[in-house]
Structure formats: structure tokens, C-alpha cells
Amino acid sequence: MRHNARADRPNNIAWERASGAEPAGDPRSGMEKIMTTNEKALALHEQWHGKLETVSKTPVRTREDLSLAYTPGVAEPCKVIAQDKEAAYTYTWKSNTVAVVSDGSAVLGLGNIGPYAAMPVMEGKAVLFKEFGGVNAVPICLDTQDTEEIIKAVTYLAPGFGGINLEDISAPRCFEIEERLKKILDIPVFHDDQHGTAIVVLAGIINALKVVGKKKEDCRVVVNGAGSAGVAITKLLLTYGFPNVIMCDKVGIVSRSTEGLNWMQQKMAEVTNLGNETGTLADALRGADIFVGVSAPNIVTPEMVSSMNKDAILFAMANPVPEIMPDVAKAAGAKVVGTGRSDFPNQVNNVVAFPGIFKGALEGRAAQITEEMKLAAANAIANLVPEDALNEDNIMPEAFDPKVAEVVAEAVKSHIR
């Protein structure tokens, strides 16, 4: 898969406006035209007609080419694979290809927009797999939100892929779908909204702690948002060794006495908030050292930040509007602030994780992506920022650094058993 980069530039006003050219025949010629990012994206998606295309690795220009790529020669690898299905890794694209699977039920901040509307996101994800990790990826949007049907569909599709990246499937269904597929399939199954997010958050926190001079054992951590990302972040922080993690959601602090929790939130209530505190997000943040938000815009106030411990770390990752704007958080006393956005310092973005994770898992023929691999990936990402370059505005590696995917892949491979 690659970008659909045509040599013949389409002659249409939408494309010319998006690319900065003066549209021929535009009635507004001579007038200033300023397009927003959203307008540019829409115009370019119209021009692209999809961000991917199929490209052949082998030329088919002669009769011999045809006989080798297709009949009769293609029968030979088929016969070998029929005797040993593992040979598919040698004779097909299975060894370096993943499926990006979504039901469109929880897409970005757009919610349940369905499989058709989810396709641009899945195409974009596939582009990032290829561009940043060299991994082929195929977007698959399923027209069902039934858990059993999704599990069956992915199981039936699995022979053609070396891994499954689940994407934008709503909680709590996403937890069951991933866990059951991991038990059924012998290839890696990875819900990036959960684990990719958790890995980059942990990487950022590792470096932020170095900047503020605190130890994980001494930190009170508040994770706001008890959906797929919040649950996975909390699990990985606990695995890493943070002893004091409190989850919050719309109901406030999640405790063992909180009513209306789904089954996964109930499980998390058993291993977090060991003091069984109750109250609001403001109550949880009082005396906290670290805040991780994967929730809603503008729900953290300056007063809440001021109530946190000195040199607080805030990752406000709601998109496109974070829980609190970085300048406001800094003015209220926060030391290190990260967001999910590229226009602020410390972008905490999954793109530094998932391409390398799958690259390593595929190259090492891992059957699963384990907790050890996730921790190794987080440490590898953190270590990509040199100690002498670490500061409150530089805790994450640059996504365009070509070393990122390679380093993460090696970290993953080193923990394949």
C-alpha cells in the first residue's frame, strides 16, 4: 500500500485551493483565499479518492511473468502452503501485513458514526503504518456492531494477515472483542486506542518524572476517563509500578461503591483507589502529582491544577480541545503539560508507538503483544529523548524521526518468547 500519488494533477478548484494554487476561472480570483485545515483536508480527500492504492511488487509484462505470478506457476506456493500453513509467511504478504478493523462505533471525538464514515480514519491509519513503520495495512470497516459478528468476521479474515489492529470500537465491547480474539487467533491482536495510547502516556510520564525529579512510588496519579484508553493507561501504570492510581469518570471518582459501572470499570475499581475515596474530579486532583485526561474538553480548571502538588504533570489528551489548555495549566502551576495535538509542545501521540510495535511483532513472529513488550516499547520511546535534551517542553521523541519505529521494534522483539 502507498499514497495514491498521481502524476496528473486533477484540474479542479478544490485541489488548487488546497495546494495553494490560483484556481483557473475561480470567480474569486484576485481575492485572498484562506482555507482552514478542515477545508484543506476535505478538498484533498476529494482529490485523492482514498489515501491508498494497491501496487504490484512484481512486473507482469511478458507471458513468462504472467505464468510465474499467476497460473500455472502460482500453484507451487499454493501446494507448499497447503502442506504447512506457516509457509504463508514465506510465500505471501502475511509476514508484513495487518488488518485495521473498525465498526465505526467510537471514531475520534465523533462518536458512533458507522463504518462508511470511519473509512477515512482507517485509511489514514494504514498510511501511518506504512510511512512510519514500513508495515502494509488494509482498512476494514465492518457493517455490524454485534460483538459475536465482529469476532467471527475477524476470525474469518485472519488467515490473510500477520496481525490485527482493532480501531475505534466502543467500550466495553472492545475489551471482550480483543480478549476473545487473542485467545482464538495465533497472530497479534492489538486495540491501539487502548494500548498504543497507554504506551505513549507511560513513555511521556517516565520522562516527565525525570524533569520534575519525582519517583513513581511517591506519586498520586489521577486518570480521567474510564473508557478504553483510560482503562488501558491505568492498567499499564499499575504494571509499571505506580502504587496510587485513581480513576475518574462522569460519575466522579470511581470506587467500589460507585453505582452504574460497566463490568470492566467494576474490575478496575477493585485494583485502583485503594483508599476507596469518593467525590468529584476536583477532589481527586487535590494533592495529585500526575493527571492524565482522556475525557472531555475544558473540564479541568486552574483551581484544580493549583490544588495539585508542586511541579505537577498534566497530560490533557482530549481532542481536538484538551481538558485544559497548556498555557492555562502552566499559569496555574503545572510544570509539564502534554496534549494530543501537534501545535503544542509534548504531543503524546500513538504514532510513535503502533508502527514500531507491529513492525517488531511481525518481524519476530510474535503470537501476542504482551505486557512486557508494552513496557519495553514505552521505555524505548522515552529513551529516544536524550537526557541532556529533556526539559519541560521536550519529553517526547519526534514522530518523524526515522529511528523511532526501529528502536521500538527492537524493544518488542527482545521480549518475544
Predicted regions and their residues:
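Glycine-rich phosphate/diphosphate-binding loop of Rossmann-like nucleotide-binding domains
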Residues: L108, I113-K130, H195, I199-V292
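General beta-strand structural signal in soluble alpha/beta enzymes
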Residues: P139, N165-D168, V189-D192, V223, ...
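Rossmann-like adenosine-cofactor binding region
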Residues: Q266-V336, R341-D343
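N-terminal ligand-binding/catalytic initiation module
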Residues: G20, E32-I187, A409, H415
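Short, low-complexity intrinsically disordered segments enriched in A/P/G/S/L with frequent Arg
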Residues: R9, S19, A24-R28
